[in-house]
Amino acid sequence: MLRNGSLRQSLRTLDSFSLAPEDVLKTAIKTVEDYEGDNIDSNGEIKITRDAKEEVVNKVSIPQLYRYTTTLEKLLLFIGTLVAVITGAGLPLMSILQGKVSQAFINEQIVINNNGSTFLPTGQNYTKTDFEHDVMNVVWSYAAMTVGMWAAGQITVTCYLYVAEQMNNRLRREFVKSILRQEISWFDTNHSGTLATKLFDNLERVKEGTGDKIGMAFQYLSQFITGFIVAFTHSWQLTLVMLAVTPIQALCGFAIAKSMSTFAIRETLRYAKAGKVVEETISSIRTVVSLNGLRYELERYSTAVEEAKKAGVLKGLFLGISFGAMQASNFISFALAFYIGVGWVHDGSLNFGDMLTTFSSVMMGSMALGLAGPQLAVLGTAQGAASGIYEVLDRKPVIDSSSKAGRKDMKIKGDITVENVHFTYPSRPDVPILRGMNLRVNAGQTVALVGSSGCGKSTIISLLLRYYDVLKGKITIDGVDVRDINLEFLRKNVAVVSQEPALFNCTIEENISLGKEGITREEMVAACKMANAEKFIKTLPNGYNTLVGDRGTQLSGGQKQRIAIARALVRNPKILLLDEATSALDAESEGIVQQALDKAAKGRTTIIIAHRLSTIRNADLIISCKNGQVVEVGDHRALMAQQGLYYDLVTAQTFTDAVDSAAEGKFSRENSVARQTSEHEGLSRQASEMDDIMNRVRSSTIGSITNGPVIDEKEERIGKDALSRLKQELEENNAQKTNLFEILYHARPHALSLFIGMSTATIGGFIYPTYSVFFTSFMNVFAGNPADFLSQGHFWALMFLVLAAAQGICSFLMTFFMGIASESLTRDLRNKLFRNVLSQHIGFFDSPQNASGKISTRLATDVPNLRTAIDFRFSTVITTLVSMVAGIGLAFFYGWQMALLIIAILPIVAFGQYLRGRRFTGKNVKSASEFADSGKIAIEAIENVRTVQALAREDTFYENFCEKLDIPHKEAIKEAFIQGLSYGCASSVLYLLNTCAYRMGLALIITDPPTMQPMRVLRVMYAITISTSTLGFATSYFPEYAKATFAGGIIFGMLRKISKIDSLSLAGEKKKLYGKVIFKNVRFAYPERPEIEILKGLSFSVEPGQTLALVGPSGCGKSTVVALLERFYDTLGGEIFIDGSEIKTLNPEHTRSQIAIVSQEPTLFDCSIAENIIYGLDPSSVTMAQVEEAARLANIHNFIAELPEGFETRVGDRGTQLSGGQKQRIAIARALVRNPKILLLDEATSALDTESEKVVQEALDRAREGRTCIVIAHRLNTVMNADCIAVVSNGTIIEKGTHTQLMSEKGAYYKLTQKQMTEKK
């Protein structure tokens, strides 16, 4: 085969090993994703600090990278590498055959031109027999290489993929196991989101970087070395000449990788800011909507994606320059080699065959060097990604929950001693929490800890569970330092129930079973009865088999708390820790649960932390804490007699406890209004969500969302299941798979860029057919008139400079302008989609289909997937189509018989390309489904690691994780063999084409010499093969396009959704509110649980300036009233009026600007305290003095002032740097600074200690003056002064009136107050 065959082979090799430049882009993006979350400054801006840069380049060594492989796997790596090296060496050796067959065709053409004389100009006698012999030798060599390349592809890919999967499987298991054994202080600085990224993304990078691409890197390096050896041995002079251009080509190859890496990092880091906005906004959507923060979040997001777009355009610019330069340098090297080579052939110092062999070998070797760069970059990426993984794997926890060390032989009685304990949280070492704490609890005693927020009460529980170790002093149990007790043994003998319980996304039965191994059904039912949970569980459609949802969102707050209490009681622990265990229960439930807890406390040591003093008045010992120290100790009677801190706390509570319950569908629990439907539906939706997330994680590497290869029934079923889930998701979004025309329609604002890119791509499509004409014309010079040899040879050599200019310009323009169009489309769709999402009603977010993780995935991954449909890959498709049509036309012009043969063989080549795409497709579709369940388990365990460790269930979650990995791991091993088989086939079909084409060409020349002369055969062959050599570049587009059609269907479907309540709409009446509220026969059911009606004809009215208090049991509909007033939902029946206007006629945004809400569990944002207080307001309209005054009213100013950074202190993600009471007071300040006309208080003071509550309640009482206030509260002292108290039961009001009136009526309200007065006495 002639010289251009080696170039074509190089181009094919580029495609065959999936080294298209877009893969370099993917690799570069993956290099930085893991680090983006750690490089956000105090303003939420992305920064690249010195440490961040060092982290990015920190890599493990190659031996360390493979340290989790067995001896057998290392042997397979060696075999795979050896075959790859041999294969790489064989490719340049093929150039020798190309030189020989080229010389044979030239010789035969010379004989024909000499009118049958068999003597060549060199004097050699060259007969037909010689010609047949030379060509058939090459044909048989090609046939051998067809088989050899199939076997080589099979061995190399299978070995590497098998080893990569085995190693990755071990790493996944060990990584999760290592995470779960780390101490809690480590999690304070290593957020679950970052760990999840490492689990999914980093491990995928390691898998990719240790898989078949490394084999390809060895093959390219071998090809590079061998290529130059062959070149120097055939013509060292021409080799040196070509080396003048080769560095440029190699430089271009590395420039592509470098520019892609650099700008992909910039783009990804800039979008990290946007992704953070999305996650924070969607996960806290009720808070954002109620505070009118939507436009602020849209602006933040728009700014971030605009920055990402600019980085993407710069990426396209440098990519275009690099592509253009590389393509142009190829043709420049042709021109230089041919121009000089012609002279040497003319002088007799070089023959044509050696010239082409040298040229082919140098081109093949130099291109291999450039192609090895991206592959080695993938290895470098894996080394960098593995660094973060191995850092966790190698880290020895300070407190190792899996350690077997420590005493297990002791029979715990429950004596607890805290001796001179000093402690600060590692994440805030400058803020001391405990300052010499001393206390003693005797076995069997019930001890209560009371004090203001931040005094260190909950810290004692954390230290008892050994979440942390003390800095000074010690804590002992039965005289043994807790540090000397086996950790698992300790935690299995201690049970804790916290204020905000963590439930797992499984059934109620499975959640309770986590409390005790081997629990019987009888024990579970008994525990649920004690926790007052049995009754409500029986009312659920699936009883104990009811799925509780992500974080228990299918249950109300009180229901979640009772499940958590039951989970603790089944353990029958020696030590029971109750941290606000009944704070979320209504009075009726709390009374029963408290009795159960009182019974449970008998015979065991119990430590109670409670703001409601009625829950601790019967404690054996009450310990008052202040500023991290114990200030007084005694029982209730003794401490009341002392009239100290405890006395002050008690007297501040007129009534001690609850009337009401934790509201159904809590406002602050962002997804809590999602209701239980059925177990099957819940499972399918949750699986669908994880499928989507995992699919997006995997599809960010390579591949498409289509079926995998059909090998057997089981594999076919898995592929179909994955596709059916995707189709189901499209159906759930009322969408259909999109197409190119719809994508182009959405890109029409950028029509000019598209026109320039597509036009230059069309022009570029004629370059390769023109190249085939120029090249065969150059070859024909060697068989033509010797007198014109030199001039004609130089002429056609210089014509390649024309191609160089055309190719360079076209490559640059189409890459750059298609990049502009695609990046602009990405920006537009991200902004449109985010705006559309934020304009949806709250019921939209209650659906698991629209969980924050899914929406984040849509914006972060699906939109970029859509972009790939019209980026530079699309321009290569246009170029390829034009090139193929023009090339086939030329082939038929030169010789239709030969053209028909080659075209007949092309489907086999296309099938090979299909197998390659199919290979990647199957891999990614399976990844979407196979790892879904395991990923869900891992993420949930990591996010709730405190609960997991407190339950001593690390092994349970680890085993569940491993169990879910088994089937996908086995499928991946099978897939390694299938991929090797298909890859070997794809790698060999092109050699089969050459075998058949040269054999038929020889037959045509012999049988029909007048029509099919050697040069006509070559013109036909090169017209098609050169023109179709770009097919390899184009094939990388179609897997991406398949992803784009699925992603686009979902995205465009979402964009077509019109919200029932558009929070961003300008429509509706904008009136100044005075505060009159009327509910008239309102009926309502949550969208996710339409069969359960919450409000059943609720009616009431509140005059301007009045305060209405709503009390009643859990699930009666109190918090639903708040949600409807905020117009999170619309009623199913009845009407709601504000100042005489039906709420549906009012502009939602304007109305909410005059309403403020404070909920039980406030949501704070990861910004400063001041920014949290003024969130949703125009910063220019609020002075710092107003902020400080609001903080004073909320009794938080002094605390803020004592912080090192004051109001500029960042509160952490969801306010994690603050205690519950501190977060609540900031939320109250946030409400007060708004000066609302209507104030909604949903358990506004429930999280506050009594001392703080007294001051805050006074502030709220003052804040109520002159405005309408609707209060939901457990503590009756917060509602007794209300103008009207309404008792809600089963969705209706059963009695209402003032405190005095209701007390005189001696109804439901009276009974509750009497109960509390009895406790008070």
Swiss-Prot record:
ATP 2 binds at residues 1112-1119. InterPro entries: AAA+_ATPase (IPR003593), ABC1_TM_dom (IPR011527), ABC1_TM_sf (IPR036640), ABC_transporter-like_ATP-bd (IPR003439), ABC_transporter-like_CS (IPR017871), P-loop_NTPase (IPR027417), Type_1_exporter (IPR039421). Residues 1-77, 371-753, 1038-1321 are cytoplasmic. GO terms for biological process: defense response to Gram-negative bacterium; innate immune response; response to metal ion; response to nematicide; transmembrane transport. Intestinal cells. It is a multi-pass membrane protein. Energy-dependent efflux pump responsible for decreased drug accumulation in multidrug-resistant cells. PANTHER family: ATP-DEPENDENT PERMEASE MDL1, MITOCHONDRIAL, ATP-DEPENDENT TRANSLOCASE ABCB1-LIKE. This is Multidrug resistance protein pgp-1.
